[in-house]
Amino acid sequence: HKPYGYLSQFIYELKRKKKLLGELYNFPKGTMAIGRLDEDSEGLLLLTTDGMMSEVVRSKKVDKEYYVQVDGIINQEAIEQLQKGVEIGFNGTKYSTKRCKAFLIHEIPAFGARGKKIRDERHGPTSWASITVNEGKFRQVRKMTAAVGFPTLRLVRVRIGNVRLNDLQAGEVKEVENFQIEI
């Protein structure tokens, strides 16, 4: 479970001090992340020492589900826009996202407090939605919620294919034998 504030990599060559995955656990030599979660995102991050497995998962259209806390109370109209696809900026051009699954989450997920406070409650209400995509453009889910008027405050990946985060706590690592992902 990648915590907030960590890069989803093991080596960082710029001068600024960043928190890296290798600080969480004594991973085997050659461990790499399958895909990425940005520094501000949390949740399920698959790691492997098998470069072929990494490539298979990244090259296939595997569903990735995110629980997203947004600014304001997201409405059904915004959910339907997300489902149909929205226009976002990508590599300096406009990009229309593919259709996705999206729905409002009525109960607040039990992820525990984030290391850094999201914001003061005096700034108004927030709500949670589930968004499942099978593509992965740079900061795509954040851009999608902003495009429908509900900026992302917290983003937690809860599923990749058939692999779920379940009750794994931030910073915890679970080793999986004979790993296979359903596509």
Pin down the residues of each PLM region.
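RNA pseudouridine synthases
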Residues: 1-183
